[in-house]
Amino acid sequence: MRKVSVLLFLAWVCFLFYAGIALFTSGFLLTRLELTNQSSCQELPGPGPLPWGSHGKPGACWMPSRFSRVVLVLIDALRFDFAQPQRSHVPGEPPVSVPFLGKLGSLQRILESQPHHGRLYRSQVDPPTTTMQRLKALTTGSLPTFIDAGSNFASHAIVEDNVIQQLNSAGRRVVFMGDDTWRDLFPGAFSQAFFFSSFNVRDLHTVDNGILEHLYPTLDGGSWDVLIAHFLGVDHCGHKHGPHHPEMAKKLSQMDQVIQGLIERLENDTLLVVAGDHGMTMNGDHGGDSELEVSAALFLYSPTALFPSVPPEEPEVIPQVSLVPTLALLLGLPIPFGNTGEVMAELFSGGSDSSHPHSSALAQVSALHINAQQVSRFLHTYSAATQDLQVKELHRLQTLFSKASARYQHFLRDPQEAEAALSTLTAEFQQFLRGARALCIESWARFSLVRMAGGAALLAAACLLCLLASQLAVAPGFLFRPLLLIPVAWGLTWTILYAGVSVTTGSKIDLVVLGAVAAAGSLLPFLWKAWVSRGSKRPLAPLLPVPRPVLILLLIRLATFFSDSFFVVEARATPFLLGSLVFFLVAQLHWEGQLLPPKPLTMSRLGSSAPTAPPRHSGAHALWLGIGLLLFTRLAGLFHRCPEETPACRSSPWLSPLASMVGGRAKNLWYGACVGALVALLVVVRLWLRRYGNLKSPEPPVLFVRWGMPLMVLGTAAYWALASGAEEAPPRLRALVAGASAVLPRAVMGLAALGLVLLLWRPVTVLVKAGAATSRTRTILTPFSGPPTSQADLDYVVPQIYRHMQEEFQGRLERTKAQGPITVAAYQLGSVYSAAMVTALLLLAFPLMLLHVERVSLVFLLLFLQSFLLLHLLAAGTPVATPGPFTVLWQAVSAWVLLATQTFYSTGHQPVFSAIHWHAAFVGFPDGHGSSTWLPALLVGANTFASHLLFAVGCPLLLLWPFLCERQGPKRRQPLPGSESEARVRPEEEEELQEPLMEVRLRDAPNHFNAALLQLGLKYLFILGAQILACALAASILRRHLMVWKVFAPKFIFEAVGFIVSSVGLLLGIALVMRVDVAVSSWFKKLVLAQQR
């Protein structure tokens, strides 16, 4: 089997999984139709005259305006409790001291001194709680969909009707300053704008200070009708430090001064709106739907009396989208066409000078009626354009609205029993509006069951292919190359057929369906052909070759994907499953008798065969490996982030950056520990390379390990020092610190890239020495005429070269007898593959560590230690000298996958959007990336899926390590002085003198080597594919579950992206092994050619 065939076959299998994931995703992730219809003053939302109070008003549009100006202060991530008044201390209870409590004192003073002028609300936010989706909701009044969360940093212009567009249509002057996301959402919509980059979450002050530079001059200038200021410091402080850091108190105090300054400058016709777009978790993150994330603050204030009654003791809870119709009607604008929010009715009370006895209540009902008309029109238009809305519920709501609207018109003609009638109308309109919103929330989950079923079936078929092909890969005489040509031909045929039908019918070619058709068309013929060929060549093997204990553990893990409760505790369940598998591995060694004490060796009689070799590992050695692995797994579990659903859990404080620490001494101690972890990791790898002799090679990769990697450690340590103390630097040095913070990470990443290039260029780390031969003249090479011209010739001569190369490789150069022949000795061939793999993993680990917070370097150290111990434990029970094909056991692959998952959680990640480490996008780019989105996405993705990448690239070590751990056979007994054995070597002792072949044993059977790599890749893809299949089935079966968008959908997305990263890493890792193998073949060929001269 050729190397190219192995890579192509694995790439084809990956394509099958990709096609299944894409097809399932296109049918599962909800979307909704965005209507481009617009409201206008000339077209009322429903039949009938202008509402009450609009007659005789100049420029009346649906309702007369109450305010001519609005100042909207949007404080990003202003959680409700940040603005909640601090309660007085109750005697007998411990005082509460939290940095964010009571810092917005101006709000509390207004609520106490002017209760009719200001009001604080708890704004209930619709998930996802990402900034771009919240801005869309705050301007359109529509509900976001789950798929919108992926567009948070790829904002596009809003095409739906919105408040900004209505302001422009009415000729109002809109001035904006702050978050530059608004520029992408509303291009050219502002009469004046001051945009500031919003993506650098480590920068707490640039945006806010830039706003303050223009806010008060613009406010006093008067050339505006709506002024919008979007502050980002609170949100960035939460991302960088969390809400409990003293910096949060400073930032909130700054916002309080801003609010107080605005209140002092407002005129009577101006409304002040202070709002948070979303909240934040206890860690300062957002994006999910936890109570802290969906609870934002909303404060309204006017110099004139705004509310007819005093505020309640507990602030009222209102949907965030209610602000859109409220602002539109208060400003005399049409409500945006797609709004689903409900007006805040108490803001529409009639004045005390009105002639109507119930003017206040009637004005509120009129606002609700207009709002209900607008929502009813939207539902009618939307249901006509798509079939998303439930017909039965839609009909019930339309009946409710028709009755309430008729009763309202009748009341205007005959206002009898006004108080009871108005109360009934208010309740009916509110019931309709809330029911309509609930209908939209429930119905905007557009599932295509056909695509979901097709995607799941394609994933299941790909898993079956991996299971079947992994058995066929090591079958004698089985050829994959001709078998692969059939599915490729069928896939191309079905692709051309589908494209031709689409073009003929005039329908648009769907790339997702095209890929699925190609995948299915290529997969089914292969399964049929493989099954027939398999059955004809040998008896049927069991369909489930996975050992029963491993199968049980795998089924338990897959079953947990169907429970939201297990998702919550997966970070703790994964180490338990890993520990159970380690216990099974140790128990298996015990069952095989490898944990028993070795029997005493007996001397054989003269002339008998030599004694057998001792076991490769003692029982105590394997037992200590298992205990050490469990201990390191437990230590890695100390680094954990608690999910939102476990409020009693406390996340590890070690996952926060050193910059968030207050104590200087503790920060210095932790910094020393982090640098120590870097040094220890480098030392461990260098000691390992030195043990196997690869560190003595003069090749460029080894020289880079000696000199380049210490520079990488130094650069990383220097960057951490600057990042942890950048805010404490003197002002005159801050520019230098900022420049160094950009240069150092790029230098480390550049060095890592250089090391990988050198490794690919010269991957063979072998030391060759030439010297005078000893007195022994025994010839070690079988006579061979001419250079090797085929792979078979090379496979024949290579083992002979290596078995005696360290003793005497006799050249045929022309030398005098006095000088003697020249001997060439080569070292480190036994670990040539593993040395390249370990070096590559270390080169990848340093940039990935740089993308994490400093203390996660301890997790990376534990990662390498866990991997080394697991590899040694697996090697203890894997025979390498037995005849037959090479293979990697299922329990080894399962343990490797579990270790990758455990490291994912230990590095502070969770399969939820709110736990994504956005700060990684600014490592090396403190000033942001401009308009580029692919580079920050790459950095954040590398941070999130670092464990998937490292373990996938290192997967071939599962095959290589047992050969690396092959030990030397028994040494030759010392001859008696003066005996004949001093001058002659017996054949028995000659066999005992042989060095272990170790990884060169793989060179004895290159076809078996390539087949083993293929089988390893298929087994790894099977386990990963089984996990993504389980997530897809869970999401489809539980698509109407309460937690589908909170738990199952994010888990599916993370598993899907993790599978893609792992599959790419697996291909790269196997390709690197093959590159080393090609280089080793070329190296041997050069030696043979030199021998011929």
UniProtKB/Swiss-Prot annotation:
Glycans are attached at N268. It is an enzyme of class 2 (transferase). InterPro entries: Alkaline_phosphatase_core_sf, Phosphodiest/P_Trfase, PIG-O_N, PIGO/GPI13. It holds the Pfam family Phosphodiest. The chain crosses the membrane at residues 4-24, 460-480, 483-503, 512-532, 669-689, 702-722, 748-768, 831-851, 856-876, 945-965, 1018-1038, 1052-1072. Coiled coil: none annotated. GO terms for cellular component: endoplasmic reticulum membrane. It is a multi-pass membrane protein. Keywords: Endoplasmic reticulum, Glycoprotein, GPI-anchor biosynthesis, Membrane, Transferase, Transmembrane, Transmembrane helix. It is found in: Endoplasmic reticulum membrane. Belongs to the PIGG/PIGN/PIGO family. PIGO subfamily. This is GPI ethanolamine phosphate transferase 3, catalytic subunit. It comes from Mus musculus.
